[in-house]
Design a protein with these regions (language model features):
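Conserved donor sugar-nucleotide recognition element shared by glycan-biosynthetic enzymes
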Residues: 1, 37, 90-93, 151
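N-terminal helical cap/lid subdomain that shapes the substrate entry/recognition surface
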Residues: 1-39
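Conserved H-loop
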Residues: 11, 76-80, 107
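A short, structured active-site edge motif that brings together acidic residues
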Residues: 18, 76-91
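Short, acidic loop-to-helix structural element flanking the phosphoryl-transfer center
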Residues: 26-57, 63-70
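Short beta->alpha linker loops
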Residues: 39-40, 61, 88, 116, ...
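Conserved Lys-Pro-Asp/Glu-containing loop-to-beta segment of HAD-superfamily phosphomonoesterases
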Residues: 92-122
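Acidic, Mg2+-coordinating phosphoryl-transfer loop and its flanking beta/alpha structural elements
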Residues: 112-152
């Protein structure tokens, strides 16, 4: 999180980081229920599930928040495994990624990490797994092109990529 704040010109000293992060998370917790999930997300999750593709979530969100979000949007039945971090500074996503991969109990060649940040691409590289980047999330397509992984812009494209 601090490296992202630095990139966008926000202060990164510990006090400012704590304040900005706390304010963001508190607002997000209050307002996420008025958000909508991306168009095509439910259809994509259902299509992948219907053909037997195992789906899981690895997130920089606090695990308790992540579970609340997933339950609110009634997505829990799509995911076999859900892993979030233990603090809201997203400092542990790389660390929990190894445990998450172990829980999948499958060959790395069968795992595809679908993410929306360069950090997700870095995690995939560190885990030595394939990655597909989604430009409709945190990082723009311009930023995501810094990675060598393929980029898609819709959930229909995600489904087509996975099913091809």
């Amino acid at each position: 999180v601090s490296s992202y704040y630095d990139q966008v010109g926000l202060p990164t000293d510990l006090e400012s980081l704590n304040k900005i992060s706390s304010e963001f998370i508190n607002k997000y917790r209050k307002l996420y229920k008025v958000c909508n999930i991306h168009s095509g997300a439910n259809a994509c999750f259902e299509k992948l599930r219907s053909v037997g593709i195992y789906q899981s979530v690895l997130s920089a969100s606090m695990e308790s928040d992540l579970l609340s979000f997933i339950l609110h949007f009634k997505l829990d039945h799509y995911f076999e495994n859900i892993s979030g971090v233990g603090d809201f500074f997203a400092s542990g996503k790389s660390n929990i990624s190894h445990d998450h991969l172990k829980k999948l109990n499958t060959d790395k060649s069968k795992v595809l990490l679908i993410g929306d940040t360069l950090h997700d691409a870095e995690i995939a590289q560190n885990l030595e797994i394939d990655c597909l980047l989604f430009s409709g999330g945190h990082n723009s397509v311009e930023i995501l092109t810094e990675s060598d992984f393929p980029i898609v812009g819709t959930f229909d494209e995600i489904c087509n990529y996975v099913l091809d």
